[in-house]
Structures are given as C-alpha cells and as structure tokens.
UniProtKB/Swiss-Prot annotation:
EC number: 2.8.1.4
Record's protein name: Probable tRNA sulfurtransferase
Family classification: Belongs to the ThiI family.
Pathway the protein contributes to: Cofactor biosynthesis; thiamine diphosphate biosynthesis
Compartments where located: Cytoplasm
Species for this entry: Clostridium acetobutylicum (strain ATCC 824 / DSM 792 / JCM 1419 / IAM 19013 / LMG 5710 / NBRC 13948 / NRRL B-527 / VKM B-1787 / 2291 / W)
UniProt catalytic activity: [ThiI sulfur-carrier protein]-S-sulfanyl-L-cysteine + a uridine in tRNA + 2 reduced [2Fe-2S]-[ferredoxin] + ATP + H(+) = [ThiI sulfur-carrier protein]-L-cysteine + a 4-thiouridine in tRNA + 2 oxidized [2Fe-2S]-[ferredoxin] + AMP + diphosphate; [ThiS sulfur-carrier protein]-C-terminal Gly-Gly-AMP + S-sulfanyl-L-cysteinyl-[cysteine desulfurase] + AH2 = [ThiS sulfur-carrier protein]-C-terminal-Gly-aminoethanethioate + L-cysteinyl-[cysteine desulfurase] + A + AMP + 2 H(+)
Lineage: Bacteria, Bacillati, Bacillota, Clostridia, Eubacteriales
Keywords associated with the record: ATP-binding, Cytoplasm, Nucleotide-binding, RNA-binding, Thiamine biosynthesis, Transferase, tRNA-binding
Amino acid sequence: MNKLLMVKYASEIFLKGLNKNKFEKILKHNIATALNGVKFDFVFDSGRWFIKGEDLEEVVDRVRNVFGVAEVCIVTEIENDFDTIKNQALLAVKESGKGTFKVETNRANKGFPLNSMDINREVGAYILKNNDEVKVDIHNPECLVNIEIRKKTYIYSKRIKGVNGMPYKTNGQTLLMLSGGIDSPVAGYMMARRGVEVSGVYFHSAPYTSERAKDKVKDLARILTKYIGEMTLYVVPFTDIQMQIIEKCREDELTIIMRRFMMSIACKIAEDKGMESVATGESIGQVASQTMQGLVVSNDCADRPVFRPLISMDKIDIMDISRKIGTYETSILPYEDCCTIFVPKHPKTKPILGQIRKAESVLDKEKLINDAVEKMEVIQIKND
C-alpha cells in the first residue's frame, strides 16, 4: 500500500489531437521543474500520471500551481483485490469524518471481473454495513470515494483544484510591461496561464523612483516564477526620456507621450529578443491613458500584437486575482514607479493621434529609445 499523487491535466490538452503528446511532454517537464529539489518519481498507469515522493504535501503545493494541471489527488495505491478495495474505501470514509458518501468507480482495466456499477453498489453496501454513522447521498455527498481500477487500484476522497490553463511555453512569447502596481502582474499570470512564455520590462526613473521601487518589481517577478519557474526582467532607464518630454511637450500630453515611448521600447526589445507580442495590464477606462482613444494612440507605436488580458475587468476582480496568486500585498507597497511620478493635473483623456504625433516630433525619439535600450539592465529571476 503506497501513497501517491495523481495528476489530472486540463481537458483542453485532450483536444490537441496529434499534438497531444507534445503538450503532455512539456507539461511533464514543467512539473519536474516545479519539483526541483524534491525527491520524486513519475509513475504512469493506463493514461494516468502519478508522482511518488517522500513529502507529498510539498509535492501537492508545487504541482497544483503548474499551468495545465486541472486537479491533484493524494491516492492510496493497492492491488486489484476486491476485499482490499472494499476495506480501503471504508477507511477513506471513516478518515473523512463526513456523514454522507457516494462511491464512483472508473474501471479502466476491463479485465477486472466486476463492472463499475457493480463495484459502486457492493462497495457502498460494505461501507454501510460496517459504519452505521454514515448514509448514502448520490446527489450531494459530503465524501466522494473515487476508485480507479487500472494495472493497480487507486482510491481517494479528496480533490485539490489546480490552476488549469495550458502548459507553460507552448504558445509563443510575450514581453509584459511590468510596473509595481496591481494590474500588470495579474496580466502576466493570465498570459502565462494560456501557455505564453512571459518576460518583463520595467521602466525605472532614478533618482525620482528609488531602488526599493525596483526591488518591488523584482519581488513581483519572483512571485510569478512560482508559476513559471523563471523570468527575464529588462530594466530600462527612463529618466532622460521623461525629462525631455517634460521640457518640450505640453503638460496635458505628458502621460500619453510617455506611454507611447514605453510601447515603442517594449516593441523594440521584443523584436530584438524574438518575442512575438507585448502584454500590458491595461483595463479600459481605468485611468486617463486607458480610455479607448488613449489605447488607440499608444497602440499606434506597436509593430506587433499587444495583448491586454484585463481589458474588460473591474478593478475589484483584478484585485481578487492578485490576492489569489500572491502578488497583492507586494503590489500595494507604497513605492512610486515611473507611471505615478510627473503626473499632470489634467491629462488628456481623448488624445488625437495626429496632434500627439506632431507634439512628439520635437523629440529625437529614435535616439532616446536606442540609448535607453542600450543602457538597460537584464536580470534573471528564479523561483527560490
């Protein structure tokens, strides 16, 4: 009798046809990466993955956060002996401490002499006979006893939800515009959850923003590596660009012109590093630069797709996800970033593209962008 972790992967993977094996292979690699430093072995039995390890609680905590994992269950592995199956199912109900139960069987091993309905009926009757404190509830049981009969039998009563999604690094690359706020880390998480490899770019305005602000962004990236393993963070010096904009452009146009520079720089880095897209944490109408007109004007600088996974979400929903993934408490630390300094009193909310292009024509945009990219710092962030 052994305790193992059974891994059920996202149903989308089953829909990949001839590519399913590729997705499974990458998911298995990602699970192994998540378990770095933990002693474990993979066991495969008739279409199910199992993990054998010394510290299953630690294994559960790591594997449940791997994109592509739908569910994990700590199972008891036993021989295909019906008396043993009945006794182990009885024990599972007793250990649950619940008052109602139901038995569900998946008989993948068609050589087993009883079919699934017979197993459910006989095991349920055995539990009732040997435990007078419980009763059957087939519609809403407090304890669901799952029996999977394969080369061996696996019994479990507790399911732990995974994060679902697609296996990481199966769907291209994006450069996330990562600030120190609540939104952009959530956007990065949501892109990664769809299998997109995520790197980050942070615009640093020293000395107006402190090293603590930069450290905060590094900490946010590190939290994301809990889900993606590692992340490259590009830190771009942005002060010279901001000073030029402040000196030569109208105050009410500062924000949108700064956003256009950020977009241009992000696209240049993405091109240089072979990334197909840029991602942001923008949500329509949330701030002055995120009106429909503002997004159109900033998008004008993009030479590749710009993904905004939060575009239609309310702030409260974004905050809920931020708490769930563990970035919220870091995001609300009171360190200013380049987006919160030099904010005009009355920024334009309906910028006109032609006017903004004309306004920034007084700047040597190409030189400013190239200088910033040339001076950028590259930091590798890994899951500790």
